[in-house]
């Protein structure tokens, strides 16, 4: 039994390392799988695609790179891209260097004497920006200038781009992105854990070698529990939220027995494991602060979509290979209608906010309560209203949440105690983060005084702990309890509408990021010599005929051999046919 676990872990680790070969986990046929269609095959896509500048040239990663390549080939446009790059660099510059970096931008791009002067930024705006730079430079100083540049680029340059070979290439990538996704798109590895409707296992995309976690939702189990709306809700929220602090949905597909969500794989284990199983319970405050900042950024991204998470607890915060965290398991998350409040007594005992326990109407407030619980537990090594391994009834834990104050040990600095106290305020109207500014108010608390959130969001800060790349941070294969067989449930055509809403294939932004991160984009995005069209982009050149399969080649070779060996006289041929006919009948009657 131990051997089975060792084998499963060894195979998984080898896959995570890229298989040890030059292809880094890619299939031998990866270029064939990702072969561009001829541009003539993309005409339907050209007619139906939403021609929005921000979607095509800014939000979508491959679209952004191709628009950049287009601008670099047009005289006078390259400086606009360089300006936007420098503004992005300015926004993650340490505060003490903002003045010098801002002056560099003003001199190089916003001065009429400069050879790369950007005239599209109005002189009044330039004067205002220069004045603010001298008074007190801030991260958002050049935001309005950058917007002016985008306003220019989305005009004539964007329309020229739509008629260029770079946009044609983007259509080819979109065609690949929209190809059907099945279980054969992936290699499957060991089970990592259990979800509400089925197992979670590691998987790898054959074409790119990228590792993911596949969350299987068994169709019969969903139907038996009437969990269709819950499963579809989680899928749609994951699809919409594109955050580096929340697990991303990359693919959604179905098999005969299950619906599958293919998600960011988090190899470093969950916070519960690290709080309680790595030395003394709890973290040093510096480490707790780093995780709290990343969790806060994840909540901010969810709240931007008007989505409340409702299940913050250590088990749902996962670490990746590098030690960064992501919020996982959005099964209880819900989108709040604009200008409305919701009601629902859901969550985990000891982490539910007072307004949830009292079944009151609420907005985003339960998530700030949950953040307070997490910060407290990371520092103290136990949750604020329940001792470690304390056996206590649910009703008693709920009473403590509603009536008692949390106790702070010497482990807490004044700033840590203050932020926990303000986040764990019983009255949600008085709670930190529950005013109009939301997460921005929490970020300004002295606890985060030394945290540069811009650099954190840009992935430029090193985590305080890096998981061991040779470790598998999950239970042994045989210790993960298996689901029992669902009986008495039949699937029929009435379920097909739900399955079609769920099984939508690739999710654009994660899929495009995958192509870039695995260097498939770099290797395949090739044009003709000296900026000319490649054959697959040449409308006047017919597409290559598809390669014949193995069986076709074998059949053709056999047919040629038979033709060479068959006798030429007609009588012989008839005799051979008759003989075969006789043999066939003889065989049939024996």
From Swiss-Prot:
Residues 186-448 form the Protein kinase domain. It comes from Rattus norvegicus (Rat). Residues 449-514 form the AGC-kinase C-terminal domain. Belongs to the protein kinase superfamily. AGC Ser/Thr protein kinase family. GPRK subfamily. The modification Phosphoserine is found at residues 136, 484, 579. Residues 1-185 are annotated as: N-terminal. Residues 560-571 have a biased composition (Polar residues). This is G protein-coupled receptor kinase 5. One of its GO terms (molecular function) is lipid binding. Keywords: Apoptosis, ATP-binding, Cell membrane, Cytoplasm, Kinase, Lipid-binding, Membrane, Nucleotide-binding, Nucleus, Phosphoprotein, Serine/threonine-protein kinase, Transferase, Wnt signaling pathway.
């Amino acid at each position: 039994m131990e051997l089975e676990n060792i084998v499963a872990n060894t195979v998984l680790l080898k896959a995570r390392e890229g298989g040890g070969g030059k292809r880094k986990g890619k299939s031998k046929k990866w270029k064939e799988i990702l072969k561009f269609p001829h541009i003539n095959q993309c005409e339907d896509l050209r007619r139906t695609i939403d021609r929005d500048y921000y979607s095509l040239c800014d939000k979508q990663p491959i679209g952004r790179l191709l628009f950049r390549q287009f601008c670099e080939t047009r005289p006078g446009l390259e400086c606009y891209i360089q300006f936007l790059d420098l503004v992005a660099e300015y926004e993650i510059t340490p505060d003490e260097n903002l003045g010098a970096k801002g002056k560099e931008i003003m001199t190089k791009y916003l001065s009429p004497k400069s050879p790369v002067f950007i005239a599209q930024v109005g002189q009044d705006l330039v004067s205002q920006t220069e004045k603010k730079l001298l008074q007190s430079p801030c991260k958002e100083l050049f935001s309005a200038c950058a917007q002016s540049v985008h306003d220019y680029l989305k005009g004539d340059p964007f329309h020229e781009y739509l008629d260029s070979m770079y946009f044609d290439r983007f259509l080819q990538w979109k065609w690949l992105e929209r190809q059907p996704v099945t279980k054969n798109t992936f290699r499957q590895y060991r089970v990592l854990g259990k979800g509400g409707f089925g197992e979670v296992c590691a998987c790898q995309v054959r074409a790119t070698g990228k590792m993911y976690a596949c969350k299987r939702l068994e169709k019969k189990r969903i139907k038996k529990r009437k969990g269709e709306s819950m499963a579809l809700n989680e899928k749609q929220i994951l699809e919409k939220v594109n955050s580096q602090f929340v697990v991303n949905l990359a693919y959604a597909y179905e098999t005969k027995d299950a619906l599958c969500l293919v998600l960011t794989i988090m190899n470093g284990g969950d916070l519960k494991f690290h709080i309680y199983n790595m030395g003394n319970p709890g973290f040093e405050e510096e480490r707790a602060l780093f995780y709290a900042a990343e969790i806060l950024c994840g909540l901010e991204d969810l709240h931007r979509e008007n989505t409340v998470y409702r299940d913050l607890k250590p088990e749902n915060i996962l670490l990746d290979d590098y030690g960064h965290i992501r919020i996982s398991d959005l099964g209880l998350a819900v989108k709040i209608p604009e200008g409305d409040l919701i009601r629902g007594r859901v969550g985990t005992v000891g982490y539910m906010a007072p307004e949830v326990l009292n079944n009151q109407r609420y907005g985003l407030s339960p998530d700030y309560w949950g953040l307070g619980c997490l910060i407290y537990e990371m520092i103290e090594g136990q949750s604020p209203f329940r001792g470690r391994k304390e056996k206590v009834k649910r009703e008693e834990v709920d009473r403590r949440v509603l009536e008692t104050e949390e106790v702070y040990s010497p482990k807490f600095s004044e700033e840590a105690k203050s932020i926990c106290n303000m986040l764990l305020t019983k009255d949600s109207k008085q709670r930190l983060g529950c005013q109009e500014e939301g997460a921005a108010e929490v970020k300004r608390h002295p606890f985060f005084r030394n945290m540069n959130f811009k650099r954190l969001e840009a992935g430029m800060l090193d985590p305080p702990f890096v998981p061991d790349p040779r470790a598998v941070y999950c239970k042994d294969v045989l210790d993960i309890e298996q689901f029992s067989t669902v009986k008495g449930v039949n699937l029929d055509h009435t379920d097909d509408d739900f399955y079609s809403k769920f099984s939508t294939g690739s999710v654009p932004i994660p899929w495009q990021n995958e192509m870039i991160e695995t260097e498939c984009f770099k290797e395949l995005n090739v044009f003709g010599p000296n900026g000319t069209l490649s054959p697959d982009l040449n409308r006047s050149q017919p597409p290559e005929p598809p390669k014949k399969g193995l069986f076709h080649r074998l059949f053709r070779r056999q047919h040629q051999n038979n033709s060479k060996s068959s006798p030429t006289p007609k009588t012989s041929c008839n005799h051979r046919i008759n003989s075969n006919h006789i043999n066939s009948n003889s065989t049939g009657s024996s």
